[in-house]
Amino acid sequence: MATYLVTGANRGIGLEYCKQLRERGDDVIATCRSSTQELDDLGVRVEVGIDITSGESVVNLKNKLSGLKIDVLIQNAGVLERNSLLELDPESIRRQFEINALSPLCFTRAMLNNLAEGSKVILMTSRMGSIKDNS
């Protein structure tokens, strides 16, 4: 049995990760800004109020998890503005970059003490990062 930490776990792919990991008997720590009934019903550890762009939020989680070994960190939290690249305003582009690229790296750095040798980090991405698919 392994311990997984999943960011952006309250819906979509993150929620499905939590479901499948729980079904096979793994320990799951689900993080999100706000939970859902479906996530709460899984019986996994849910840490709410976690905004990966907020240094304070990440430090609070780091302190809560002090001494806990994480075998796999699944960085799933992200946003997607459903506009074409030409329609995106600079603030929206900055926000997406911060949430989808910079914050997962900072979050991983904050969790380094929880990641032992052999632990794995999974960084989810989307087709939004593709120049070919978005031009």
Regions found by a protein language model. Name each.
Residues 43-56:
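Rossmann-fold cofactor-recognition segment
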Residues 107-111, 115:
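Hydrophobic positions on the long internal alpha-helix
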Residues 10, 14-20:
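N-terminal Rossmann NAD(P)H-binding glycine-rich loop of SDR-like oxidoreductase domains
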Residues 6-7, 75-76, 120-126:
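Structural signature of the Rossmann-like NAD(P)-dependent dehydrogenase/reductase core
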Residues 76-83:
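Conserved NAD(P)H cofactor-binding loop of Rossmann-fold oxidoreductase domains
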Residues 24-39:
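Conserved glycine-rich Rossmann-like NAD(P)H-binding loop of the short-chain dehydrogenase/reductase
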Residues 84-93, 120-135:
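Catalytic loop of short-chain dehydrogenase/reductase
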